Amino acid sequence: MEIEFSGEILHWHGPSPFHFIVVPAAECATLKEEWSFASYGWGMIPVTAHIGDTAYTTSLFPKDGGYRVPVKDVVRDAEELDDGDVVPVLLRLRLPK
């Protein structure tokens, strides 16, 4: 199962700062309808994310009725990405073993 979209890299400046991309509403509807069976604790959904030439494992986390894709520092460094960049994202569902 795959979902593709483009999104902006945002920087959250909280007590534990991190970068993420907001999943668009239409794709969130698909996630809720078709991928929720794979959810674990607090609605997290395990995925392999592809940004540019970099693939990494992470989990989508629910926020404000939608989902966020965490973007690891190693991914941002490898792809030379900055806050505000709009990038194509491919998500593949990771099924529990």
Regions found by a protein language model. Give the residues of each.
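Long, compositionally biased stretches
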Residues: 1-64, 85-97
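Short alpha-helix capping/helix-loop boundary micro-motifs
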Residues: 35, 72-77
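Short, structured beta-strand/loop micro-motifs enriched in basic residues and often containing a Trp
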Residues: 65-73
